Amino acid sequence: MFKQVIEKLTELGKELGIKTVFVQDIYQINNNPDISYPVLVIESDETRETLDLWQYRFRLTYVDILAEDQSNLIDIQSTGMELLSKLLRNIPENWNLTSSSYRTFLQRFNDECSGVYCWITLEVSKEDIC
């Protein structure tokens, strides 16, 4: 089910206009000199199991390239929040989003970038496993 969750998050991001998706390592941005922005990074954190469900915690990060004068800083962060919010509204109805919190950032990778990351917790019933 873990793989299915990551694949679905990737699919939803691409449907919303994300050009590049990385899984598990935000610093892959530095290893790709010809990267296409915006980028979505899906990183797993803690996974818990109960008798009936899997509980996954992820950090979803939206990254876009910053103008030299940083004039698009707030636009990038605002767009990132809106995109991540839309992504979360489109997760399957049988997945329970129990929490989400957002934080903006400014970061130098190979490019000067800005964006927002969102910690989420999803509960997925074991009955949903294909």
Where are the language model's segments positioned?
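Low-complexity, acidic Ser/Thr/Pro/Gly-rich terminal tails and inter-domain linkers that flank the onset
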Residues: P33-E43
